């Protein structure tokens, strides 16, 4: 599980490494089908991301000497490319540090 979380932590270090607050918030976006014909796949993927973030937050990950709090912002793309584009744009507008998903 550590190896699978390494890319998320590495991305967070690169993007959030210069934050000035005592505790920094690292926003991770997730886009996947949580409705529609393949909703079960998107929900499983999102639940896995939530579990990984819970583990990171429980461990108290430090980035650049500051405690990092990870947050998951999730959007439903219903397995539709147009909705996927819109969902991804919402996450960009929310200034997420990285995005996972898009099955």
Predicted regions and their residues:
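Preference for short coil/turn "hinge" residues that link or interrupt alpha-helices
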Residues: 7-8, 12, 31-34, 96
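Gram-negative bacterial Sec-dependent N-terminal signal peptides
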Residues: 2-20
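Beta-alpha junction/loop-to-helix N-cap segments that form part of ligand/metal-binding clefts
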Residues: 25, 40-45, 59-103
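Short N-terminal segments immediately surrounding and downstream of signal-peptide cleavage
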Residues: 23-35
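Short catalytic helix/loop segments, enriched in acidic residues and glycine
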Residues: 46-58
């Amino acid at each position: 599980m550590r190896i699978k979380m390494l890319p998320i932590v590495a991305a967070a270090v690169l993007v959030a490494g210069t934050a000035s607050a005592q505790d920094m918030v690292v926003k991770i976006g997730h886009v996947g089908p949580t409705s529609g014909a393949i909703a079960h796949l998107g929900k499983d993927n999102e639940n896995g991301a939530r579990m990984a973030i819970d583990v990171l937050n429980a461990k108290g990950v430090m980035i650049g000497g500051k405690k990092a709090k990870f947050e998951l912002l999730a959007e439903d793309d219903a397995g539709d490319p147009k909705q996927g584009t819109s969902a991804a744009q919402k996450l960009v507008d929310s200034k997420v540090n990285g995005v996972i998903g898009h099955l």
